[in-house]
Amino acid sequence: FQHITPTCHSLWRSLACVQDGVLSNRNTKTRGGISSAGTLTVRAGMLNNQQGFMVGQKDMTLNAGTLDNRQGVLGSQASLQISSGTLMNQKGALKAGTDMLLSGGDVSNQEGTLAAGRDLNAHLNVLENQQGTVVSNGNSRLDVTRFDNQGGRLVAQQSLTLSSTDIINDAGGLIQSGASLNLRADTLSNRNSGDRGGVISQGPMTLNAGTLDSTA
């Protein structure tokens, strides 16, 4: 991969970055990073935003084979759409002022934050959310092959739909909706919920699981 370090910082019109190799914006949280007052579109073989800062006031679209946002900040005041084969967001933050759409392969969100101001939709292979937070102020819909939420939080202020082959919600993990909750899984482990964890709905709950383990 060829490494390209962007020189743009504050842009008052739409910004598009296309790079077949590595687009690096790492270590920019304390010195500006990339910001756009318009839409922001990035396409790269790898986008490295580790400890970086990348924000837009309007819609943001990111397409990368690998996206590294460990301890970084990626955010849009409008919608945020990310397509990535591998997304690393450990202790990082992905935030959308309105809707968030995540699609692709594996997402590592240990101690990280995925937050949508409105609806959140995710179509993924694996979502690792140990001690992490996935939250929306609207509806959330997640279709993932494997969801590990040990000690993590998946919260929708409105309806929540979660479909997965394997859901691990142990060790105080929380899956919660403010309205209806629809959960489908081949295997659901909900052990050791404690006082703050478990599967909680403020509205109707539909639970379909081939195997359910909810021991204390």
Segments the model singles out, each with a brief description of its role:
Residues 1-216:
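A composition-driven surface/loop motif
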